Curated annotation (Swiss-Prot):
It catalyses: a ribonucleoside 5'-diphosphate + H2O = a ribonucleoside 5'-phosphate + phosphate + H(+). InterPro entries: GDA1_CD39_NTPase. This is Nucleoside-diphosphatase mig-23. It comes from the Eukaryota. It is found in: Golgi apparatus membrane. The active site is at E174 (proton acceptor). Its EC number is 3.6.1.6. It comes from Caenorhabditis briggsae. GO terms for cellular component: Golgi apparatus; Golgi membrane; membrane. The chain crosses the membrane at residues 9-29, 490-510. It is a multi-pass membrane protein. Belongs to the GDA1/CD39 NTPase family.
Length: 553
């Protein structure tokens, strides 16, 4: 009976053991899939906007949740502010000393690493996108700077630095990125919006997007959506897809987008000073009266050829605006625009037949600074108020403006802004009205710095565009996890069945053993002695069975 009891205990133990294994397996499988599906992986990205006057760092992070929605990217926040840092001068100044380019970016890389978990850094892409400043330097200098960054930057940071992520971007892509950023910030890509944009596919419901004008130091960009049925054909028409699936038209957009290289405010000043120099040569003098500076402000200008002259401010803003207009619409224009075959923007750029006065437009960078920092008129655009305030400001003596600045009456403006405000306000308004034909009275234009409390930068749009495939990667991974989990669930029933069969087998063996190993009294009742039984066991060749049972006993 002792052997039988052992077999019974063994069977019960086996059943409990197998049941525990199956339960643990089931719980672990459920826990794994829940952790993967509920706690999505957070990813990071770094982008440097290498502009004409400096380079700015932006650090973003995101959690992709669905391949049917646009990737949700946000700036990394530290101390209630987005992580951002600007260094000067611009990257283009290293054209003559390219070996120092990577070291110049070291402070930005070090700051980014402080806000990215160490284990995430090798998988964090770094984008170095240079804009107008780098476009203007000689080709050999461009290549030397880029080569240094591609070679040396991986030695400075543990983040992911790829050769193709360090480049000079075309001006139109700067415009596309800005367009993406502003519409993303406004929620125009959300599926919850229902109004159809004219010309989109039947039944395709999405919000009407807005246009944008970004006025930088060296260039200006414009971008707005065209209806699908618009037949305007130009190299400035770009089709983009922000979704992670190429066959999904929901996030596909047709844009008019172009850049005006050399028409940023700082390049505008250079153009203006060249015209002043030309006038001065006709007068054989060294000092010229300048309507685009406050009264009695003096500025010495050194031209590229080494010639010097002095600008002396007269503070006549209306005359300044008229002079600036001539810079946008020179007498020499393209034959297409002269023949009026097509509508054209300034710089003889053919334009679609869409009145921008009727398009909701947002102005960035200098459109905000030049209306807000000194004039205090940022926001909804009012041409009359801007002209009036500009005329009042520029008509002041420079000494009066300096005194007001010392009293903190211009808290948002440094001295350089105060000196150039007259020209810049004339430039941005002339570009808007004379360059893009936006009506001065009836328009939907506004200048902005932030949207929904967030500073809008084209860097955000660039990150959204280049990381758009992340949701597809994560959804594919989750699908594999689910399929694996489903397959494992199908094994539970066979495991239970096999465990039951095994336990039953052990019980049967135990029962058989108990019948063979009964006591002497029962054997005697059958007319058997221990000796006879033992002899018969040997005679019937039950040795192997005995050995088998002895192993279990």
């Amino acid at each position: 009976m002792r052997v039988s009891r052992r077999f019974t205990i063994l069977a019960i133990t086996a059943m409990i053991f197998l049941s525990l294994i199956i339960c643990i397996y089931a719980v672990a499988a459920h826990t794994t899939v829940n952790v993967i599906l509920q706690k999505q992986e957070r990813s990071y990205g770094v982008i440097c906007d290498a502009g004409s006057t400096g380079t700015r760092l932006f650090v973003y992070n995101w959690v992709s949740t669905s391949d049917s929605e646009l990737i949700q990217i946000e700036p990394v926040i530290y101390d209630n502010k987005p992580v951002m840092k600007k260094i000067s001068p611009g990257l283009s100044t290293f054209g003559t000393k390219p070996d120092e380019a990577a070291e110049y970016l070291r402070p930005l890389m070090e700051l980014a690493e402080l806000h990215i978990p160490e284990e995430k850094r090798p998988y964090t892409p770094v984008f170095i996108f240079a804009t107008a400043g780098m476009r203007l330097i000689p080709d050999e200098q461009k290549e030397a700077v880029l080569t240094n960054l591609r070679t040396e930057l991986p030695k400075i940071t543990s983040m992911q630095v790829l050769k193709e992520h360090i480049r000079i971007i075309e001006g139109k892509w700067e415009g596309i990125y800005s367009w993406i950023a502003v519409n993303y910030a406004l929620g125009k890509f959300n599926r919850t919006f229902t109004p159809d944009f004219p010309g989109t596919s039947p039944g395709q419901q999405r919000s009407k997007t807005v246009g944008m004008i970004d006025m930088g130091g060296a260039s200006a960009q414009i971008a707005f959506e065209l209806p699908d049925n618009d037949d305007f054909n130009s190299i400035n028409v770009e089709n983009i897809n922000l979704g992670c699936r190429e066959d999904d038209s929901l996030f596909r957009y047709k844009l008019f987008v172009t850049t005006f290289l050399g028409y940023g405010v700082n390049e505008g000043i250079r153009k203006y000073e060249k015209t002043l120099m030309a006038k001065l040569k006709d007068q054989n003098g060294t000092v010229i009266q300048d309507d685009c500076m406050p009264l009695n402000l003096h500025k010495t200008v050194t031209m590229e050829n080494g010639d010097n002259f002095v600008r002396r401010g007269t503070g006549n803003w209306d005359t300044c605006a008229a002079e600036v207009k001539k810079l946008l619409n020179p007498e020499t224009s393209s034959e297409v625009c002269k023949a009026e075959v097509a509508k054209c923007y300034f710089g003889a750029v053919p334009a679609p037949n869409i009145p921008l006065s009727n398009v909701e437009m947002y102005g960035f960078s200098e459109y905000w600074y030049s209306t807000h920092d000194v004039l205090g008129l940022g926001g909804q655009y009012n041409a009359e108020n801007i002209a009036k305030k500009s005329e009042q400001y520029c008509g002041q003596r420079w000494s009066t403006i300096q005194a007001a600045s010392k009293k903190n009456l211009y808290p948002r403006a440094d001295e350089e802004r105060l000196k150039t405000q007259c020209f810049k306000s004339a430039w941005i308004t002339s570009v808007l009205h004379d360059g893009f034909s936006v009506d001065k009275t009836h328009n939907k234009f506004q200048s902005v710095s932030t949207i929904a409390g967030q500073e809008v930068q084209w860097a955000l749009g660039a990150m959204i565009y280049h990381m758009r495939f992340f949701p597809l990667r994560d959804s594919t991974r989750n699908l594999i996890v689910k399929e694996t989990h489903s397959a494992s669930e199908s094994l539970w029933a066979p495991l239970f069945f096999l465990s039951a069969v095994f336990c039953l087998f052990v019980l049967v063996c135990a029962k058989e053993h108990s019948l063979l190993c009964f006591d002497d009294k029962r054997r005697a009742s059958f007319g058997l002695t221990r000796r006879q039984y033992s002899y018969k066991m040997l005679k019937e060749d039950r040795t192997s069975s005995s050995a088998f049972l002895e192993n279990f006993a």
